[in-house]
Amino acid sequence: MNAGFILLNIVIVLALCLCSGIGTVNGRTVSVIEVVFKGYDNVRKLVTWADAFSVVLYGHLYLALPLIASIASLPIICDELRTNNFYFHFSRIGVKHYIPLKYLSCIVSGVGALFLGLILYGVFVRLFFPSSYDFGDSQVIGIIENNSLRMIMSAAGYLLYMLCYVAMLSIFSCGLVSVTQNIYVNLCVPFLLNYVTSHILLNTKIYVFLLLCVLFYCTGYRLWLLKYKGVRA
C-alpha cells in the first residue's frame, strides 16, 4: 500500500468538499472555504455545520468517487506490474495470496481516503460554522437541535452508502488492472461505470453493493489467475 496515493486521495476529497458551493453573495455562489476565509458572516449565520456537511455529502462529490477508487489501484500498476516487481511477491507469498492482498489494499486506500477526508472536513466545518441558526430577533427555538440530529443521522446513512459504493468501485478498478495496465484506461473506465449506474445504485439497498462487490471480486480474481496462471506460486 502506497501512503502517497492515500494522502493524494484524502487531499482530493478534502479539496472537493471545501470548494463546494454553500450560499450566494451578490448573486454569486460562494464555496465553503470562501465563506470561512473571506468573512461572509451573513452566509455563515444561516448555515450550521450540519448543513455544510450535508450539502457536500448530497452534492456532486459522488462524481469524484471513481477517481478516488481508481487512484487506489495505481500503486499496483506503477510500483509492481509495470516494473515486474510482482514476480518477487509471487515467489514470496504466491499468486493466490498476492491477489487478495492487492484487493484489500485497494479497498482500504479508496474507502479509507474517502472516510478520512470527510472526517477532516467535518472537523473543519464544526470549528468554523455555528451549531444553530441565527435569525436575529425572529430566531425559532425548540426545533433546531432535533432537526440537526435528524440531518446528521440521515447523512450518516448516506455516508455508509457512499463508502460501500467506493468499495465496489475499488474492487472493480483492481480487477480492471488484471486486464490492462494502461493508467488512462484504469482511470476512465470507472467513470463510465459511475455515469451509467450511479443514479441507480445510490438508491438501492446496501446488500446490493455487497452482492456486486462479491461479483466483481470473483470475476477479477479469476482474471488475475488466468493472466498469471503460468507463474509458479
Task: Name the predicted role of every residue range.
Residues 1-2:
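N-terminal Sec/SRP start-transfer signal
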Residues 12-75, 103-178:
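Secretory targeting signals
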Residues 211-233:
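Junction motif at the cytosolic side of a transmembrane helix
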